[in-house]
Curated annotation (Swiss-Prot):
Keywords: Cytoplasm, Developmental protein, Growth regulation, Repeat, WD repeat. Phosphorylated by KIN10. Residues 28-56, 771-818 are annotated as: Disordered. GO terms for biological process: embryo development ending in seed dormancy; maintenance of shoot apical meristem identity; negative regulation of autophagy; TOR signaling. Residues 28-44 have a biased composition (Basic and acidic residues). WD repeats lie at residues 1025-1064, 1070-1111, 1125-1164, 1168-1208, 1214-1255, 1259-1298, 1307-1344. This is Regulatory-associated protein of TOR 1. InterPro entries: ARM-like, ARM-type_fold, Raptor, Raptor_N, WD40/YVTN_repeat-like_dom_sf, WD40_repeat_dom_sf, WD40_rpt.
Length: 1344
């Protein structure tokens, strides 16, 4: 049973349910847990409606087809800003405020009683009768010496109940010297612990105006003053003083003056000096016989007895209860199952609650949690304030407490006391009678539950929190208290911090020692919440053996997957950067338990919980991260074979976690102090494991999720750190001219033009010396010119001897050369290194800025420097964001090789000299190559554009590796609320319902409208100010917004009703530009803007219409590789909301299908053509259907749901010209398409019935540049480079022609570059090469 269900079943009044497994973001309306099945259901419903439009079911299915329910890219991972993702080298560890800096103990208690029985002090006039009881002894009931001794013993016993382990010293009617010896002895014994000094001055005068207290001379004939300064010098700190005498505040004032507590710079010793005083300066102690003479001491040391006696006289029960019965309350104070024990328990809960609610949390922790005896005294001090104020006496403390005597929790205490007293006569009369427990705790838990139902972070915190803590001590209330505590902790990190501050930690830590099955689930949940806030608790857990509790839970058969995921999270935190935790969990077979669960996840098994898989991987990764023994055990347990299949899981979080686990299984590299020869003999099994791991990681280097690719980059950085030399060899091998053909997909860092300074930053490097067959290695150093003209001059250097090592100017690993052989550590296949270098360069030009930054960092690890692009000048204008959307990236130009043939420049520099690649694995007979260096003045130039070397010669090289983010990011899931209903999504659902209603109304209008003519005069005309004209545009379905982009991938958003620019930003900062298409994703919800570039890069933005607030949701490269001989990819894409698929193709032999819900390439469909794809159109009502137009004028229809996806192929266009536009016709017909050729003809086809066209429109005589087909209305539009737009009906009737802008001079429109219809209204947006975007509508529309 799930945790939420468990709570509900146990307490039906607690409406709690657990959120579905890996759905992190409540902002999404529908669950994505079963996207494929939902997709199939949606498609089935839409398919079933063909030919049956009369039934209600068909109408529903039709609306489902037109209004797809699929929502993508709205998980928690898409809310994380690119800029906020950590790339640093160290984590910021926050010191938890709830944890006490140090616990303290009162080690010694000095009791000084100055009673001088039978002699009243001269300044006291006693009433008759007056209070006489001291320590519950009547001093006149026995001989004075005996009475004094008995009182001293009683007082000592009363204190011992609160701190039995302290040493107690009593001085009765002492002299100054005796007090001095007592104090010095106590301090000597206590050492650094606290000393308590209790002073009873009932037999001496009240303190002097200077705060001196009185003691006796040896003969008891005089009162001797004792200065507070001397007392303070003997006891020192830490200390606590109790002064039970009249005018006791005089003493506090003297301490304050002594320590200068009033000044802001007072010493820290004042914090370690605590004082409790019985009354204020002008007050005398109560003399009423209602109270004992030492009422203050009685409150502090015997609170239950004192409280009941005081209450009894004020209760309605006073007539029927004999006060003497209070001394006979059955039970023990420390046994909560007895009446006395329960009363003490309730009293503790009440006073803790009062203190918690009135004191600052720091002061509460200091007084009520740091020292057991101090906590007890301050709880009892609250009672003293209540009782003594009724006698016009005001107890005082330092630190000063606010008034608490009228706090409403005292009413709850009075009720508990009354229930107790009402049972007392019967319990005393018949000891076998069972007492009825007080409903106090049940009622307080109910009050806490009411708060949980209505409270929040922004309301007053629940005052019952300290009571919940107390209830954990009771078996009968424990389960309910834990469930309610779990609900509270789930409200957020603020709630966890509050609970920890109140002192919950030691209680839940001790509960891990219980074996009660009922508590396991909720304890795991509570510890999940605690560790999500504060990982420092890992130390306490390992110290107390708590890790075994969670390993047993993880291995148990009864737990649900989401509960096991929490246990795996707890264990991951325990081993995170904590060697003792790693060792303890390794000994407890955590690796075996985790791998056992991964192995159990076979295809025949039920679909495993993604969150559980994710945390199993993260737990393993953290267990063997930088822990060689665990890595060895992981390899021996075939961890790779069990982790590798997870790289194809549909959830990006699982894939990223699996990459993390595999990456941390890689050894980071040998110690630079370790002998290279020793490293040569590494275990072959380790080499094979590394080889397998790297090959598996290279398979996901092009994953659709930045979360996954970031982990691949981090893993490759770890690999690069241990294999720097071999990767440099692989990089150097590509410098050979004959190797350039292998690099068709690798980028080059060419000269980058900075428009701001009109300078060119370029790197000039000399050619690489070819490896020679000469048996004797020879090396020459060559230096090269840094002339801005690019002329390279060779400077002869001194030759290096055979056995000299290559020096690294940045402290990289040295080659070890002896006898002509270079020893290389852990050698893998050369092809693996080559593939790694290609992968690193692919990452360095990643569409995601964060991944690109990581990729450049990996390249820096192997010594490859980069040219950094300077930020271009802001091109914004008033009303739009003038800054670029993210940090400028390195200028990684995409070209066919690393050579920049102009001026003979090589684009890369190695900080350490690259070596020619070996011909065999035994690297003998290598010729050393030239050392390539820059001139010092170039390196020192601020405008050189060179990145600083990442790795220096110091021992901190390893700390400079980029950090993984998946673990820290995943931890955030458990910081968020995991329990609760769907209230948060109701508002979102209402907004969607409103949009659906609007869409259905307008779809019906479009379908049943008769459009006679399109108005030549636009309703809006927008000068985009694009320098290269508008390349593509789209109209927002629910707002008067048009989004346009130019060839330089500058995006601008315009409100055409208000004629205002809303936002403008650059899609990216790479030098190569080219836009392919704009699409809207999730248009019925919070829409996202998909921007596809000509090179196949896809970037998806949120908040795109808000000035300066645009945020990159995700980015990936939709196409890998292109056809031989093709210079550019010329990517074309289309988005299908119904299936959640993005289709992409271009100068490539396949059409790739990306599932944006999984962020994964799910299929590559062969295009079945030698020509490149020039147009793509996905059906918006039939998921999986796709039409493609080719460069030779041919068309193909695919159904990607079928094993044989090609449905049919035809060539409707007579001339061999590329297909410019292609679209499915409006309606639910699955195979009617419209195709437009560059030659100017538009063909209408029904590909399911015949491959021939049933209608041809010769729209333009050549130069057709754009086609738009309305999604629902029977209208199409075409545009020409010859500056005109034509509009037609689906029957071929021309509805309009547009040639001129509406101006006095009748200026012709520009060469048409793009056309797009509004999806639900008859609006046409047209973009042209002259930077104008115009919006047209039809003249009249009437219902048929």
């Amino acid at each position: 049973m799930a945790l939420g269900d468990l709570m509900v079943s146990r307490f039906s009044q607690s409406s709690v349910s657990l959120v579905s497994n890996h759905r992190y973001d409540e902002d999404c309306v529908s669950s994505h847990d079963d996207g494929d099945s939902r997709r199939k259901d949606s498609e089935a419903k839409s398919s079933s409606s063909y030919g049956n439009g009369t039934t209600e079911g068909a109408a529903t299915a039709t609306s489902m087809a037109y209004l797809p329910q699929t929502i993508v890219l709205c998980e928690l991972r898409h809310d994380a800003s690119e800029a906020s993702a950590p790339l640093g080298t160290s984590e910021i560890v926050l010191v938890p405020k709830w944890r006490l800096k140090e616990r303290m103990k009162t080690g010694c208690v000095a009791l000084v009683l100055c009673l001088n029985i039978t002699v009243d002090p001269p300044d006291v006039i006693k009433i008759s009768p007056c209070a006489r009881i001291e320590a519950w002894i009547d001093p006149f009931s026995m001989a004075p010496p005996k009475a004094l001794e008995t009182i001293g013993k009683n007082l000592s016993t009363q204190y011992e109940r609160w701190q039995p382990r302290a040493r107690y010293k009593v001085q009765l009617d002492p002299t100054v010297d005796e007090v001095r010896k007592l104090c010095l002895t106590c301090r000597k014994y206590a050492k650094t612990e606290r000393v308590l000094f209790h002073y009873n001055g009932h037999g001496v005068p009240k303190p002097t105006a200077n705060g001196e207290i009185w003691v006796f001379n040896k003969s008891y004939t005089q009162y001797i003053p004792l200065p507070i300064s001397e007392l303070d010098s003997w006891l020192k700190t830490p200390s606590i003083y109790v002064f039970d005498c009249s005018a006791a505040r005089m003493i506090l004032n003297a301490f304050a003056e002594l320590h200068d507590w009033g000044s802001s710079g007072s010493s820290g010793s004042s914090r370690d000096c605590i004082l409790l005083a019985a009354c204020d300066v002008h007050e005398t102690l109560p003399q009423s016989v209602e109270f004992p003479a030492d009422v203050f001491t009685s409150c502090l040391t015997t609170p239950i007895k004192m409280a009941l006696k005081w209450f009894c006289r004020r209760s309605l029960l006073k007539e029927i209860i004999d006060e003497s019965l209070i001394d006979r309350i059955p039970g023990r104070q420390n046994d909560r199952k007895t009446l006395l024990g329960e009363l003490n328990w309730i009293f503790t809960a009440v006073t803790d609650t009062i203190a918690w609610n009135v004191l600052p949390h720091e002061l509460f922790q200091r007084l009520f949690r740091q020292d057991l005896l101090v906590a007890s005294l301050f709880r009892n001090f609250l009672l003293a304030e209540r009782i003594m104020r009724s006698a016009n006496c005001n107890p005082i403390s330092h630190p000063m407490l606010p008034p608490t005597h009228q706090h409403h929790m005292w009413d709850a205490w009075d009720m508990a006391a009354e229930i107790c007293l009402s049972q007392l006569p019967q319990l005393v009369l018949d000891p076998s009678t069972e007492f009825q427990p007080s409903p106090f705790f049940t009622e307080q838990l109910t009050a806490f539950e009411v708060w949980l139902d209505h409270g929040s972070e922004h309301k007053k915190p629940p005052e019952q929190l300290p009571i919940v803590l107390q209830v954990l001590l009771s078996q009968c209330h424990r389960f309910r208290a834990l469930v309610l505590l779990g609900r509270f902790l789930d409200m957020g990190s603020w709630a966890v911090d509050l609970a920890l501050s109140v002192g919950i930690f030691p209680y839940v830590l001790k509960l891990l020692q219980t074996t009660t099955n009922e508590l396991r689930q909720i304890l795991v949940f509570i510890w999940t919440k605690i560790l999500a806030l504060d990982k420092s608790c890992q130390i306490d857990l390992v110290k107390d053996g708590g890790h075994t509790y969670f390993i047993r839970f993880l291995d148990s058969s009864g737990a649900f997957p989401e509960q096991r995921a929490m246990a795996a999270f707890v264990l991951a935190v325990i081993v995170d950067g904590h060697r003792r935790g790693q060792e303890a969990c390794l000994e407890a077979n955590l690796i075996g338990v985790c791998l056992g669960h991964l192995e159990a996840s076979r295809p025949s098994d039920p679909q495993p919980e993604p969150l559980f898989l994710q945390w199993l991987c993260l737990c393993l990764g953290k267990l063997w991260e930088d822990f060689m023994e665990a890595q060895i055990m992981g390899r021996e347990a075939n961890a790779f074979e069990k982790l590798a299949p997870l790289l194809s899981e549909p959830q990006p979080e699982v894939r990223a976690a699996a990459v993390f686990a595999l990456g941390t299984l890689l050894d980071i590299g040998f110690d630079s102090n370790k002998s290279v020869v020793e490293d040569e003999f590494d275990d072959d099994e380790k080499i094979r494991a590394e080889d397998a791991i790297i090959k598996s990681l290279l398979d996901v280097v092009s994953d659709g999720s930045p979360l996954v690719r970031a982990e691949v980059a981090v893993a490759l950085a770890r690999f690069a750190f241990g294999h720097k030399q071999h990767l440099k060899l692989a990089a150097a091998s590509y410098w050979k001219p004959q190797s350039s053909s292998l690099l068709t997909s690798l980028p080059s860092i060419a000269k980058f033009h900075d428009p701001g300074s009109a300078t060119i930053v370029s790197l000039h490097m000399s050619p690489l010396t070819r490896a020679s067959t000469d048996s004797q290695p020879v090396a020459r150093e060559s230096r090269i010119s840094s002339s801005p003209l690019g002329s390279s001059g060779l400077m002869q250097g001194s030759p290096l001897s055979d056995d000299s090592s290559l020096h690294s100017d940045s402290g990289m690993m040295h080659d070890s050369v002896s006898n002509g052989a270079v020893h290389q550590p852990r050698l893998l296949d050369n092809a693996v290194y080559s593939q790694c270098v290609r992968a690193m360069f692919a990452l360095a030009k990643d569409p995601s800025p964060r991944i690109a930054s990581l990729g450049r960092r990996v390249l820096s690890i192997i010594g490859i420097e980069q040219v950094v692009a300077k930020p271009s000048k802001p091109t914004g204008r008033p009303g739009e964001a003038a800054t670029t959307s993210h940090t400028p990236l390195a200028g990684l130009a995409r070209s066919s090789s690393w050579f920049d043939m102009h001026a003979g420049n090589l684009p890369l520099s190695f900080r350490t000299p690259p070596v020619s690649p070996p011909r065999t694995n035994y690297l003998s007979g290598l010729r050393r190559v030239c050392s390539l260096e820059f001139r010092p003045h170039l390196l020192g130039s601020p405008d050189s554009g060179l990145a600083d070397p990442l790795l220096g010669a110091s021992g901190s090289e390893r700390s400079l590796l980029p950090l993984s983010t998946i673990y820290g990011w995943s931890c955030g899931h458990f910081s968020k609320p995991l329990l609760g209903g769907a209230d948060a999504s109701q508002e979102i659902a209402a907004k969607r319902e409103e949009k659906e209603k609007f869409a259905l109304e307008h779809i019906a209008k479009c379908q049943h409208s008769s459009i006679s003519k399109l108005n030549n005069n636009p309703i809006a005309n927008w000068d985009t100010r694009f320098e290269t004209g508008t390349k593509t545009a789209l109209l927002h379905p629910f707002s008067p917004i048009v989004v346009a982009a130019d060839e330089n991938e500058r995006i601008r958003v315009w409100n055409y009703e208000e004629a205002t620019l809303l936002n403008g930003f650059d899609n990216h900062d790479f030098p190569d530009k080219g836009i392919s298409k704009l699409c809207l994703i999730n248009e019925l919800d919070d829409s996202l803007l998909l921007v596809a570039s000509c090179d196949g890069s896809v970037r998806i933005w949120k908040n795109y219409a808000t000035k300066g607030k645009q945020k990159l949701v995700t980015g990936f490269s939709s196409i890998q590789g292109h056809k031989p001989g093709a210079r550019d990819l010329n990517a074309v894409v289309d988005w299908q909301q119904q299936s959640g698929y993005l289709y992409a193709s271009g100068e490539t032999s396949t059409v790739t299908l990306w599932d944006l819900e999984k962020e994964q390439l799910v299929r590559s469909v062969p295009s079945e053509s030698e020509c490149g794809v020039t147009a793509l159109s996905a059906s918006q009502v039939h998921g999986g259907q796709l039409a493609a137009g080719f460069a030779d004028g041919s068309l193909r229809l695919y159904d990607v749901r079928s094993p044989e996806p090609l449905v049919c192929a035809t060539r409707p266009h007579q001339k061999v010209e590329r297909v410019v536009g292609l679209s499915f016709q409006p309606g639910l017909d699955p195979a009617k398409v419209v195709s437009a050729s560059q030659a100017g003809d538009i063909q209408f086809l029904d590909l399911r019935t015949t491959r021939d066209t049933y209608l041809t429109i010769d729209a333009h005589r050549g130069s057709l540049t754009a086609l738009a087909v309305h999604r629902h209305a029977p209208i199409i539009a075409s545009g020409s480079a010859k500056q005109l737009i034509k509009v037609f009906s689906l029957q071929g009737e021309q509805l309009g022609i547009i040639r001129y802008y509406p101006s006095f001079m009748a200026q012709k429109i520009g060469s048409v570059s793009c056309l797009t219809f509004h999806p639900y209204q008859v609006l046409l947006a047209a973009g042209a090469a002259d930077s104008f975007v115009s919006i047209y509508t039809h003249d009249n529309s009437q219902a048929r």
